[in-house]
Curated annotation (Swiss-Prot):
NCBIfam families (UniProt xref): ispE (TIGR00154)
Top-level taxon of origin: Bacteria
Pathway: Isoprenoid biosynthesis; isopentenyl diphosphate biosynthesis via DXP pathway; isopentenyl diphosphate from 1-deoxy-D-xylulose 5-phosphate: step 3/6
Keyword Acetylation listed: no
Documented EC number(s): 2.7.1.148
Origin organism lineage: Bacteria, Bacillati, Cyanobacteriota, Cyanophyceae, Synechococcales
Annotated organism of origin: Prochlorococcus marinus (strain MIT 9313)
Protein's name according to its UniProt entry: 4-diphosphocytidyl-2-C-methyl-D-erythritol kinase
Annotated function: Catalyzes the phosphorylation of the position 2 hydroxy group of 4-diphosphocytidyl-2C-methyl-D-erythritol.
Keyword Plastid found: no
Gene: ispE
Biological process terms in GO annotation: isopentenyl diphosphate biosynthetic process, methylerythritol 4-phosphate pathway; terpenoid biosynthetic process
Length: 319
């Protein structure tokens, strides 16, 4: 890795798109020695994204502004944390940035919006500050900041193991696949609560041996997600947190019921720890038609909805 002189850092505006993700498979295998859950997941980027803009500051300050006043822009925000971490690792303490966030991914939705914003910050400032950190180094920084962040950085279709930070790239899903995504804007779910509740309810069925973990990983590697539409059967969506969250969050129950009624959907599931849920479609046209038909029912229930195509790549600097 070669870090350029910060005096050569870019003076122009750098923009980065930070896409949301959905969980096509989320399996809680057991507990790790560090207290986190061991997971086996399939994660997929979708075309619903926040937009971040970065400019250098002459005084070395790092600041964040957002068009959503409900989002904290203080030091606990992953964008700010990522900026400080990258500056620390660069060795140039006088680097600064003014960051603007256009928030489009709903907050607390199980879509990794915060993680994606943090990952986008690593990419954006790596370019703005002319640091030349490699993709592998950025993924290492991302793993320090959050379990979902390495996936958000890499994007596309990935098997995710460990806490979610260990990635194995899948053959890209069919580019035409899409989802109808639905969320109650008045409801959010705490990820730590969801995993804590999962432990309370289902720890008796947790696996404990690494050999058992690896057996489940291998089964997922060999699953039909490698070719999701090669058969007429619906793709095998799974989310172990759904059976934790849905019984206690009525909005998730309502959302899943309305999504199940969509014509042409292949399968329905909750994403992450919720409360966002989605219906999977073979192509964007089918998803758009189904959403148009059901949108009045979603609106009547107070639900926000989107049609999102699958995204085949991760976070990149925009021209």
């Amino acid at each position: 890795m070669s870090i350029s002189n910060p005096s050569a850092a870019s003076e122009h505006l750098v923009s980065v798109s930070a896409p949301a993700k959905i969980n096509l498979h989320l399996e809680v295998l057991g507990l790790r020695s560090d207290g986190f859950h061991e997971l086996a997941m399939v994660m997929q980027s979708i075309e619903l994204a926040d937009q971040l803009h970065f400019r250098n500051t002459a005084d070395g300050s790092i600041s964040l502004r957002c068009d959503d006043s409900s989002l904290s822009t203080a030091g606990d925000n992953l964008i700010v944390r990522a900026a400080h971490l990258l500056r620390e690792r660069s060795g140039f303490s006088d680097l600064g940035a003014a960051i603007e966030l256009q928030k489009r991914i709903p907050i607390g939705a199980g879509l990794a919006g915060g993680s994606s914003d943090g990952a986008a910050t690593l990419v954006g400032l790596n370019g703005l500050w002319n640091l030349n950190f490699s993709q592998g180094q950025l993924e290492g920084f991302a793993a320090e900041l959050g379990s979902d962040m390495p996936f958000c950085l890499a994007g596309g279709s990935q098997l995710c193991f460990g806490r979610g930070e260990r990635l194995e790239s899948l053959q890209a899903m069919k580019a035409s696949m899409a989802v109808v995504l639905v969320k109650d804007p008045s409801v959010s779910v705490s990820t730590p609560w969801a995993y804590g509740r999962c432990k309370e309810l289902f720890s008796s069925r947790y696996l404990s041996k690494e050999s058992d973990f690896e057996q489940r990983r291998q089964q997922l590697r060999e699953s039909s997600w490698l070719n999701p539409l090669r058969a007429d059967d619906p793709p095998p969506l799974r989310n172990d947190l759904q059976e934790v969250v849905a019984p206690e969050v009525s909005a998730v129950q309502t959302t899943l019921k309305l999504l199940t009624d969509l014509p042409g959907s292949l399968a329905v599931s909750m994403s992450g720890s919720g409360p966002s849920c989605f219906a999977l479609f073979a192509d964007v046209a089918s998803a758009q038609a189904a959403l148009q038909l059901q949108q009045p029912a979603f609106a009547a229930a107070g639900l926000s909805s989107w049609c999102c195509a699958f995204r085949c790549e991760g976070i990149k600097l925009e021209a």
